[in-house]
């Protein structure tokens, strides 16, 4: 849990950098950084810059929920990509479930402007309900158009979450999500 890490100590920063460089040295090509809005921005900028000095192609993907912070996290702090949770995902989920017009996706992309290439579009992740679950769409086929649209109609990257390609329904879970403990 990132809230328990004491970022006020320089030793913490150095240890975090050591860990990042260790994994990069083994060939890991990037990190997904959880809830970046809760981590001190000064630390994030320093970490990203420090890792990229040695591994310039290393990728940092951030999970941020406030669209008003997207520009800062990409242009100022150095993230390569951000999950477009508050834009693409929230809109497309409502479109799939019949609660919004697909036109809003175009408005979202226009709003993001030059940041669109730094977005990571997705239909599922560990925090969200599975498309095929009864808590979401109830069928993976209901997301075909959204998948096609999200992957092909702009220059954002697209993430497939493990099991999504198989139509995983997560019906073993009470909330339509897949647990890391599911077998």
Feature roles, as predicted:
Residues 146-152:
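Hydrophobic targeting/anchoring helices
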